[in-house]
């Protein structure tokens, strides 16, 4: 038996015809989606209580979820902007190495709404499809078990799901998901084209007018989604009524050409296709390249426009030179294409086929199409029909199951819109319905129940001017099996349902379905009268609580309303959302029904659960006559909803001028503010309704009223200006009426500063003419000039300079306007400022010059302009870095080239010792490394710690880059200050492939460090058996001894690596070798309890322990127990650098007690500082803010995405880039690699913890360990008594040294606990210990050196965009690779801290200390921490 949710699942909704199609660009969208998913994960981790699944009143909660993440993401864009293509790529990635390859694994379920297939718009099918996919996904174990409840299964039955979709969605999807254990990573539910099938006017209120749609279901329940599930929807930006339903969603626009990265997408799409398609490239010459530049401009961000034109070029249907003649809109393109496709009267011949396709409620097969068209022309043969399909071949595509559909739904809409398609190409869907109705008539006796419903639908929509009874006779006389047509699903269309009932469809009176059919079929008075006469209750309610009267009022059936009122229907029964018949009729604008209900005494001031009255609903929807009727009846004009918004506020927002005047004339309070302090004037100014603003001012509106953010009407008008919508005239009017032009909001921002930031040059002019202060600074020290420069608004910059703006202003971080403009990237702004005399060598607080900014951001033209003006290419910042190093680090090839040409020192090192070659290599910028080698860069240059680049690449396991260095002459034996080579560190970490490469380049396998430790000993210590075998095979000395006399066998026996011991013994290791202190492998194995190793050693002839228990012989030296805080240094956390590619090499973290300053190592080496440095080019700490609930968002952005060009054209113009494709294909091009590192190591000084260690030979008990104030341990207070006990113990028992090897490095003198001891000769006994500084020593160290601040959760933005190039990649990584320990944790006892940071053992192991020494940090953490605009 199949599950009920699998019986009726629409396959069309779970697939995309674009699957497998090549996808280009849009990387920035995937980055944003990954970031949103990560936010969900973070919120899920911090969530305490799941949301309560209680239905709200219908209006969605505004804002975002209480845990800080948005409810979901809404992809918006015009027709053809690539929404469905993006969703398809997200689910079925076409590129194996793309970011979306990882994102598609987080898809829990998906649904594609398609207007061409009504089944995909069915809410019941949507719910069943989700359930089936979640069960199949395997991502949530146990979900299917929660569906075994018979009550849940009954809700999923066909028909039941359609009758009560809200209940089915809650019981079958939401409640089971809320009851599941959160998955390891957040998941998403994708619904594409959620607005399809929602054909409503913009003014209607969404909560009822969209009832029964997928959009309404999601909008009413998205706040109840589990915190780990992200709802991802797409919709057209024109579908305002739908997009408003998803308040609190993060909206991502795909065709907002104000965003540079969207323009870049369009350009890259063209370039990618040129690069991939020879058939397209052969049409390209330098003369026709300009045509493609025109194409990218004409497309206005519409990828469908680009695709149709470029496909036409490939098919030789369109010539490139004809692009100049193609209209610049999608509708214009359709008209142009039809004029090309259909000559003379060809369109009339194929028009019937298009009519049928437009009328069909699902995709039709070729046979079905032929049968329908044949009913109009019975002489049509199948061959003739096929020829007509061939004429339409460029407009039709293959659907599922050998069906034919139009290539895009926007073209279907165009064919029915006479305004755009003209009379010549106008199609008639009603004619298509007639042909389909006749086709069904011919086969009426053999129709299935669903086909019978389709038959009824086509009859209803045929415009045959027949009454319903006559259409019912049509179906009956043709023998249509109507009786069982309602046995499975109930049609959504009420007229279809009524026709089927009249034609004899059977309704089971015992089934609860009856109430649903009664509600939906009662469109006509005679039907209601019949039912009431047969005993039906006049006040019966459906599952949503709506009465017959409420449904009739909602649909505007005046006759039915009169009948029900005459039969005594209750006028005040509320439905589940608190709506009465009057509020429903007012919301829909049914004036006659409203008058009828008012005349019958309905309560005109009734409020629903959201506080909406009939008056506010009508005012919002723009229903003038309804508003007049209610006002005439004496309604309270200032009733407000839950947000204190009145009818006047709603009408002002909606732009309904006549309603605003009517309300004002009836005494509406003009200055009444909502909960956010916004009046009707602010709402009208924000929306750009000048006439309404004028009416409100004429009636006494306070022009300088502030909202909760301190913004006035002028502030929001300057903020939201699109000049085409009349906002500039609103600004002018407000200034004329006395608006304060220099009014500051809570952030200290004036309208001028906001307008400058947004780039509204007309408004800037108006404000300056009105007396605005051109040099006003906000709370963060930003002037309008700074704001305009940060966003690259050249026209605004010129205007401000014309009005005398001061050019020498400096922000809170010491940056001039030129510095900020250089970071932003608009060369016109930079040249303008240079012409004004700004210092091209000005240093900000971090020592960065404008050239540093431009080089870091990769602005080639700006680098050229600055250098031409005299900028010094070798100027160092506070960290000793020149612009050349920054450009190399970020992978900006063209900038590196320019700086080299202008005498930048190729081997210049920063104070951390890293040069351009080092940072480029670690970031993986192969092309830049090649360029540096070609200019003579020193391949063996060492950093401040004496480590060569090859050493660091080996440490990071960057195999490819290390091999490239070796090919270019890197010294394979180059060592660090401790004598360790690249082979040492690779063996320590177990990087087998790296070891093989180093040996292949003749690395000495027996090379020893300063302590005479070999690579074999390092590998043995870590237990890397394969590395040990490899080294022995290549001649490693098995019994090589270090300074202490220990061999690899002794070390492996101590660490318990039995497989390594086995290999060493097999290759002749001496099992009886003893070190300087007489410790053999057998002895240390016995001490550590490694019984299997003891047996193995005995098998190979090791001397036994003669039956003696190891306890008295091998116990630790008896010393006084000391507090753990004096033995263990502060908490250390290691996270892999993003540059590391080694798998499975993450070593145990150095665990300890954060009693002193905490520190962290993000990487074994110095990871590049790209993330920290990227913040240098931002403006100030706070970005432009707006209220939490409105759409008064001000943050614009430019180029947030790291779009990887198809070729490196070094900032050529787009036309020049296109022309490059006309060159021979053998021409080599360099590609630009996006920076990937997001981590950075903490600095280490000569006093770093890795320099001094103290290893206790007694393992203290955690239970007796406590921390005292000031970071002192109990050991300090009890030193006298402890020392006495120790003396007694030592005198009564012989001293036996424990087998512990010395520290890997001994750089400095060893100090006693609590004091800074001068250097002195250590006794031999002490040299056998790893020394660790006490808590008192640690406290004395510089807090800045060790204390790591965790990156704040707030997203850092630069000029309105993310400054971290990989903010989207920070899934489970620590941001910037650093972790801070809360001060409260530092103050707790050590036992609590260790419980918070679980450790496999209670003390610091020698292996971990050794690991710390090898993977030591670098002194590069004192970089400037920037704050953005």
UniProtKB/Swiss-Prot annotation:
GO terms for biological process: endocytic recycling; protein transport. Pfam families: Ank, Ank_2, NPHP3_N. Residues 1120-1139, 1160-1170, 1238-1265 have a biased composition (Polar residues). Transmembrane segments: none annotated. Signal peptide: none annotated. Residues 1108-1200, 1217-1296 are annotated as: Disordered. Keywords: ANK repeat, Endosome, Phosphoprotein, Protein transport, Repeat, Transport. This is Ankyrin repeat domain-containing protein 50. It comes from Homo sapiens. The lineage of its organism: Eukaryota, Metazoa, Chordata, Craniata, Vertebrata.
């Amino acid at each position: 038996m199949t599950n009920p949710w699998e019986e009726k699942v629409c396959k069309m909704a779970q697939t995309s015809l674009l699957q497998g199609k090549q996808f280009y660009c849009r990387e920035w969208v995937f980055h944003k989606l990954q970031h949103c998913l990560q936010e969900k994960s973070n919120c899920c981790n911090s969530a305490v209580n799941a949301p309560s699944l209680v239905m709200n009143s219908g209006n969605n909660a505004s804002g975002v979820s209480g845990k800080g993440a948005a409810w979901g993401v809404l992809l918006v864009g015009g027709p053809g902007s690539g929404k469905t293509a993006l969703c398809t790529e997200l689910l079925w990635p076409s590129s194996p190495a793309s970011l979306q390859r990882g994102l598609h694994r987080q898809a829990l379920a998906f649904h594609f709404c398609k207007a061409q297939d009504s089944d995909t718009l069915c809410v019941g099918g949507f719910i069943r499809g989700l359930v089936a996919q979640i069960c199949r996904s395997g991502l949530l174990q146990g979900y299917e078990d929660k569906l075994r409840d018979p009550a849940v299964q009954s809700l999923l039955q066909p028909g039941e799901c359609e009758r009560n979709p809200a209940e089915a969605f809650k019981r079958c999807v939401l409640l089971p998901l809320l009851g599941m254990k959160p998955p390891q990573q957040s998941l998403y539910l994708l619904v594409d084209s959620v607005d399809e099938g929602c054909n409503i006017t913009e003014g209607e209120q969404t909560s009822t007018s969209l009832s029964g749609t997928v959009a309404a279901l999601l909008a009413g329940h998205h706040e109840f989604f589990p915190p780990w599930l992200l709802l991802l929807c797409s919709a057209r930006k024109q579908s305002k009524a739908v997009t408003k339903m998803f308040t609190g969603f993060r909206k991502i626009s795909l065709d907002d050409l104000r965003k540079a990265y969207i323009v870049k997408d369009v350009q890259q799409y063209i370039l990618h296709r040129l690069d991939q398609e020879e058939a397209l490239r052969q049409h390209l010459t330098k003369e026709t390249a300009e045509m493609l530049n025109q194409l990218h401009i004409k497309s206005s961000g519409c990828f469908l426009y680009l695709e149709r034109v470029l496909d036409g070029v490939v098919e030789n249907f369109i010539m490139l030179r004809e692009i100049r003649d193609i209209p610049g809109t999608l509708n214009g393109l359709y008209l142009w294409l039809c004029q090309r496709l259909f000559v003379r009267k060809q369109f009339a011949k194929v028009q019937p086929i298009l009519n049928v396709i437009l009328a069909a409620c699902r995709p039709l097969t070729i046979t079905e199409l032929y049968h329908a068209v044949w009913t109009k022309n019975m002489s049509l043969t199948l061959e003739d029909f096929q020829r007509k399909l061939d004429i339409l071949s460029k407009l039709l595509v293959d659907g599922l199951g050998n069906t034919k559909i139009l290539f895009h739904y926007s073209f279907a809409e165009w064919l029915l819109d006479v305004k755009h398609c003209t009379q010549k190409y106008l199609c008639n869907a009603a004619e298509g319905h007639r042909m389909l109705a006749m086709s069904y008539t011919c086969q009426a006796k053999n129709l299935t129940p669903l086909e019978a419903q389709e038959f009824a639908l086509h009859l209803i929509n045929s415009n045959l001017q027949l009454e319903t009874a006559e259409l019912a006779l049509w179906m009956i006389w043709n023998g249509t099996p109507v009786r069982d047509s309602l046995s499975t699903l109930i049609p959504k269309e009420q007229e279809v349902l009524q026709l089927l009932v009249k034609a004899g469809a059977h309704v089971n009176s015992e089934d609860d379905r009856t109430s649903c059919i009664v509600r939906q079929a009662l469109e006509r008075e005679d039907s209601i009268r019949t039912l009431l006469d047969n005993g039906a209750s006049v006040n019966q309610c459906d599952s949503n609580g709506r009465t017959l009267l409420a449904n009739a009022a909602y649909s505007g059936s005046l006759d039915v309303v009169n009948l029900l009122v005459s039969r005594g229907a209750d006028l005040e029964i509320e439905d589940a959302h608190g709506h009465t018949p009057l509020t429903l009729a007012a919301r829909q604008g049914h004036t006659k029904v409203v008058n009828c209900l008012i005349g019958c005494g309905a309560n005109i001031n009734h409020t629903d659960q959201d506080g909406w009255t009939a008056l506010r609903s009508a005012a919002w929807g723009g229903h003038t006559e309804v508003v007049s009727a209610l006002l005439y009846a004496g309604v309270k004009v200032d009733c407000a909803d839950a947000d204190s918004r009145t009818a006047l506020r709603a009408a002002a927002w909606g732009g309904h001028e006549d309603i605003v005047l009517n309300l004002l004339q009836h005494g509406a309070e003009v200055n009444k503010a909502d909960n956010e302090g916004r009046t009707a004037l602010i709402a009208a100014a924000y929306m750009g309704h000048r006439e309404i603003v004028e009416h409100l001012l004429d009636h006494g509106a306070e022009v300088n009223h502030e909202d909760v953010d301190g913004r006035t009407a002028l502030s929001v008008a300057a903020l939201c200006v699109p000049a085409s919508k009349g906002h500039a005239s609103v600004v002018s009017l407000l200034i004329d009426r006395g608006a304060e032009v220099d009014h500051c909001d809570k952030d200290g921002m004036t309208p001028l500063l906001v307008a400058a930031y947004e780039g509204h040059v007309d408004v800037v002019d108006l404000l300056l003419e009105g007396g605005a202060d051109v040099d006003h600074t906000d709370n963060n020290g930003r002037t309008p000039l700074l704001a305009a420069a940060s966003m690259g608004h050249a026209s605004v910059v010129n205007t401000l300079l014309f009005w005398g703006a001061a050019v020498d202003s400096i922000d809170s971080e010491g940056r001039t306007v030129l510095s900020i403009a250089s970071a932003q990237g608009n060369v016109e702004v930079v040249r303008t400022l240079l012409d004004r005399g700004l210092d091209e060598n000005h240093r900000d607080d971090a020592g960065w010059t404008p050239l540093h900014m431009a080089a870091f951001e990769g602005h080639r033209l700006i680098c050229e302009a600055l250098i031409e003006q005299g900028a010094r290419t070798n100027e160092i910042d506070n960290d000793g870095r020149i612009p050349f190093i920054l450009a190399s680090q970020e992978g900006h090839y063209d900038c590196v080239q320019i700086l080299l040409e202008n005498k930048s020192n190729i081997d210049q090192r920063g104070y951390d010792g890293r040069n351009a070659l080092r940072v480029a290599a670690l970031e993986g910028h192969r092309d830049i490394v090649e360029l540096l080698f070609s200019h003579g860069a020193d391949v063996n240059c060492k950093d401040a710690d004496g480590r060569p680049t090859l050493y660091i690449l080996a440490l990071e396991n960057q195999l490819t880059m290390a091999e490239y260095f070796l090919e270019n002459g890197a010294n394979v034996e180059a060592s660090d200050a401790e004598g360790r080579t690249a082979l040492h560190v690779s063996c320590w970490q177990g990087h087998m492939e790296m070891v093989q490469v180093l040996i292949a380049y003749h690395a000495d396998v027996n090379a020893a460090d300063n302590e005479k430790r070999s690579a074999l000993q390092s590998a043995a210590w870590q237990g890397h058996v394969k590395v040990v075998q490899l080294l022995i095979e290549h001649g490693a000395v098995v019994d090589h001894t270090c300074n202490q006399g220990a061999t690899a066998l002794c070390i492996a026996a101590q660490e318990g690596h039995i497989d390594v011991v086995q290999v060493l013994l097999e290759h002749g290791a001496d099992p009886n070798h003893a070190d300087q202190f007489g410790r053999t492998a057998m002895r240390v194995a016995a001490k550590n309890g490694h019984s299997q190793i003891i047996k193995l050693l005995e098998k190979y002839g090791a001397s036994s322990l003669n039956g003696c228990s190891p306890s008295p012989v091998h116990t630790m030296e008896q010393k006084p127990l000391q507090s753990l805080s004096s033995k263990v240094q502060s908490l250390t956390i290691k996270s892999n650098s993003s540059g590391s590619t080694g798998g499975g090499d993450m070593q145990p973290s150095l665990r300890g007690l954060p009693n002193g300053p905490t520190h962290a190592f993000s990487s074994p080496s110095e990871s590049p500082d790209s993330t920290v440095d990227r913040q240098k080019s931002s403006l100030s700490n706070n970005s432009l803010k707006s209220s939490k609930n409105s759409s008064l968002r001000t943050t614009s952005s430019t180029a947030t995405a790291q779009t990887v060009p198809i070729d490196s054209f070094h900032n050529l113009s787009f036309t020049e880039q296109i022309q490059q494709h006309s060159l021979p294909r053998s021409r080599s091009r360099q590609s630009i690699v996006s920076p990937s590192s997001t981590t950075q190591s903490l600095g280490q000084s000569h006093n770093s913890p890795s320099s001094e260690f103290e290893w206790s030979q007694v393992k203290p008990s955690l239970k007796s360990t406590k921390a005292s104030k000031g970071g002192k341990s109990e050991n300090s207070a009890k030193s006298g008594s402890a020392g006495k006990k120790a003396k007694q113990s030592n005198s009564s028992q012989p001293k036996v040294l424990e087998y512990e090897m010395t520290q890997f490095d001994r750089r400095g003198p060893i100090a006693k606990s609590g004091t800074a001891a001068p250097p002195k000769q250590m006794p031999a006994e002490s040299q056998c210990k790893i020394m660790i500084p006490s808590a008192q020593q640690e406290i004395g160290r510089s807090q800045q050196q060790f204390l790591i601040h965790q990156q704040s959760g707030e997203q850092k933005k630069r000029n309105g965009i993310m400054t971290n190039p990989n903010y989207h990649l920070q899934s489970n990584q620590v941001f910037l690779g650093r972790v801070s320990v809360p001060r409260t944790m530092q103050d707790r006892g050590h036992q609590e801290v260790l419980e918070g940071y679980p450790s496999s053992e209670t003390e610091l192991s020698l292996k971990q200390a050794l690991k710390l020494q090898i993977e030591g940090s670098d002194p590069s953490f004192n970089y400037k921490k920037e704050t953005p605009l």
